[in-house]
Amino acid sequence: MKAIVFAYHDIGCVGLKALVEAGYDIQAVFTHTDSPNENRFFSSVARVAADLDLPVFAPEDVNHPLWIERIQQLQPDIIFSFYYRNMLCDDILSSAPRGGFNLHGSLLPKYRGRAPINWVLVNGETETGVTLHQMVKKADAGPIVGQHKVMISGSDTALTLHTKMRDAANELLRDLLPKMKNASLPLEPQKESEASCFGRRTADDGAIDWQKSALAINNLVRAVTEPYPGAFSYLGQRKLIIWRSQPLDVVHSKLAGTVLSTSPLVVACGDGALEIITGQGEEGLYVQGSRLAQEMGIVTGIRLGNKPSQKLKRRTRVLILGVNGFIGNHLTERLLRDNRYEVYGLDIGSDAICRFLDNPNFHFVEGDISIHSEWIEYHIKKCDVILPLVAIATPIEYTRNPLRVFELDFEENLKIVRDCVKYNKRIVFPSTSEVYGMCDDKEFDEDSSRLIVGPINKQRWIYSVSKQLLDRVIWAYGAKENLKFTLFRPFNWMGPRLDNLDAARIGSSRAITQLILNLVEGSPIKLVDGGEQKRCFTDIHDGIEALFRIIENRDGACDGQIINIGNPTNEASIRELAEMLLRCFEKHELRHNFPPFAGFKDIESSAYYGKGYQDVEYRTPSIRNARRILDWQPEIALEQTVMETLDFFLRGVVLEQNVLEQNVLEQNVLEQNVIEQSKTSKDEHHV
């Protein structure tokens, strides 16, 4: 059986050797180049492949069309991934008739994602394991071929647990690979209700919070000790790294972080105390705890903690134009929750952001970007990150008001881009999935997909080309004027506060809002061209988390990047979306407040949108850039998003009805009182 292998790390070496022993015909091995900045404690897949006389490659982007073509030419029967760091695209996985299989370092569905060995130790788990599963679009979510359990002892560290996992992987693969070669093994679907997902860890995650229990801190030490950078704390400006420790069940009345003794070196925790067995200063030697106390001048009663700031760090100032919009108000909530940001916002309304108006880190002005140009320029100069979120982004307006779309979406935003260039400010610009137009790629890739639009007489493309031209202008300013920028492309973000029902009444809203209005009013749900168009819907909370990471921009990783933000696993036709919405509506607790369902009605696009409209059959994002740059993966299922969106609008309608009824009741009472008073006055006058 012909196999292609994607492998890295010790586990990759184990997998490669197991495949050879099982008699697989390995056509090629793909791995990663060894980074000089990485403390490499594991074996080299490239060396093992060379020793086995296997062709080995280490492309920067294995999902590039050139590499996809080369892989397809090899015509593999099956694909294996052993600790390879990148997701493989559908084109690669579909090139193997038997599919692709990945070895993951946990007992799936628990601990999907990055660094599972470190995370299980941080969280104090007593067991983990390895899982061989089929690869699907969603990371680590495919059906399971087999698992091997590994017990975690209280003395295990990341290194000792890694050794156990390597041995478990070897046993699992030696058992399964020969069977898979001869026949297809049964697959067990993962239980989504039991799934958990964890992101990457960095050296900064080793910072000790002494308020936590001694057990939790000791777990952190075990998880990041050698060969990792280690758990650390500070004595003033000096860094102290803890390599080995043990929790002590002692009762004390000291503040967390206080040194209780120096021989042994014991530090008070939020619950119990931690004995530092070995450690070192940042520039010192690896020594015993008591020796470390001597070398660093640690005395009983002194406190360890975070590194004191040289100066109080100013909050990052973020300017959001269109702050009251769907993305703007949700992003504001996320930024303010983090407490490292100060938000300045402008919009023509404030109904969605009234909940932030009392926050001292939120500053709002009601205004129009086409009028308040001086205010905007001043705040671009004042702020650090600029997000111009103002745009007309509803399809019916592209044909109904094409010139207004161009004036607002292109001309007004171009002024903002130029001010960012003028004052050397970073711009995070909302491109759109619409720029891909009628692209015929299976997945729309930021760096390689063609941007294809229709003829001039199809005016619906004015939005797409306005955004595309701004993308190109921003890119050119980056190349020629060193403008710092990131372009993000949302793919059908959806959730509470998306448009409003009043906008839906005049047809100026996105699909789900229009569908909800039909249900609320008891009118037929109109399915344009039968609702067969497919879209990949993304929960607003998933989307905002990705956008937050773009604004955060760790190590400048997002500078000069274009990033799709969408959920390829949440693909559904508009008809399927409507049917799902109807099911949620019928079982909602407020259903009795609304009329009976009036059915579906198919309608031609020209009758709904007018002449000049042209639709797209599908729009599926590649999210490799988002995974690689942001360490981001969408998690929220479509049905959950639909339920939350529906619930938001239904409760709003019922509340509005109750307020209206209360107002009518109060008015009736008032009128009745006036009548009674008038009658009393007449009676008194008569007397």
From Swiss-Prot:
UDP-alpha-D-glucuronate binds at residues 393, 398, 432-433, 460, 492, 526-535, 613. CDD domains: Arna_FMT_C, Arna_like_SDR_e. It comes from Yersinia enterocolitica serotype O:8 / biotype 1B (strain NCTC 13174 / 8081). One of its GO terms (biological process) is response to antibiotic. InterPro entries: Arna-like_SDR_e, Bifun_polymyxin_resist_ArnA, Epimerase_deHydtase, Formyl_trans_C, Formyl_transf_N, Formyl_transf_N_sf, Formyl_transferase-like_C_sf, Lipid_A_modif_metabolic_enz. The gene is arnA. One of its GO terms (cellular component) is membrane. Bifunctional enzyme that catalyzes the oxidative decarboxylation of UDP-glucuronic acid (UDP-GlcUA) to UDP-4-keto-arabinose (UDP-Ara4O) and the addition of a formyl group to UDP-4-amino-4-deoxy-L-arabinose (UDP-L-Ara4N) to form UDP-L-4-formamido-arabinose (UDP-L-Ara4FN). The modified arabinose is attached to lipid A and is required for resistance to polymyxin and cationic antimicrobial peptides. This is Bifunctional polymyxin resistance protein ArnA. In the N-terminal section; belongs to the Fmt family. UDP-L-Ara4N formyltransferase subfamily. In the C-terminal section; belongs to the NAD(P)-dependent epimerase/dehydratase family. UDP-glucuronic acid decarboxylase subfamily. Gene3D superfamilies: 3.40.50.12230, NAD(P)-binding Rossmann-like Domain. The record marks N102 as: Transition state stabilizer. SUPFAM superfamilies: FMT C-terminal domain-like, Formyltransferase, NAD(P)-binding Rossmann-fold domains.
